[in-house]
A protein has these predicted regions:
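Short, non-transmembrane amphipathic alpha-helical segments
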Residues: 82-87, 138-147
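A domain-level signal for the structural core that forms small-molecule/cofactor-binding pockets
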Residues: 52-53, 94, 128, 137-138, ...
């Protein structure tokens, strides 16, 4: 009998998928639409348009933007669209909602751009630990996309994983 230690994890055919690899680098910022409203609640069209066109949007160059309104103002749909039209010239991506909504959309976009044929009929483990904050919704979305193509799907680390699906 041999006393040689064999690293079965290293010799495994298991493919590790790390969602952190899909993290889009760049600043995430919130833009509160209420800053251009009268007393934070009333949209006066002429003043609003003037404020939007005179604002220096270059501060958001290369950023990922979560556009929202922190007050209970009743807004016409075009208000957020007018701001989006300005941001669209400088920002990488804009979403209506929170920073969590923004992060979700960034991961959905990245997952949708993946070529899943590489994972066809292979055992895949979705890495659970990462240094970046990965939204739970990204794990859910990735599972939906991978399950139809993989042979088996796990969560965690190769040395201690949770089985999720097996054909």
């Amino acid at each position: 009998m041999s006393n040689e230690i064999i690293n079965r994890v290293a010799n495994s055919v298991l493919i590790t998928f790390d969602l952190e690899d899909l993290y889009a680098p760049g600043d995430r910022v919130k833009v509160d639409l209420s800053q251009w409203l009268d007393q934070g609640f009333v949209l006066r069209e002429k003043e609003f348009r003037t404020a939007i066109t005179s604002f220096d949007w270059s501060v958001y160059k290369g950023c990922y933007v979560a556009l929202f309104c922190s007050t209970d103002a009743i807004l016409p749909a075009w208000a957020s669209l007018l701001i989006t039209a300005q941001l669209n010239q400088v920002a990488n991506q804009i979403v209506w909602g929170s920073l969590q909504d923004l992060e979700h959309q960034l991961f959905v976009k990245a997952i949708d751009e993946l070529d899943l044929s590489f994972f066809e009929s292979k055992p895949v483990i979705v890495k659970g630990c990462s240094e970046k904050q990965i939204p739970e919704s990204a794990f859910v979305y990735l599972t939906q996309k991978l399950q139809p193509v993989v042979k088996s799907l796990f969560y965690g680390e190769a040395c201690s994983s949770v089985p999720l699906f097996k054909k």
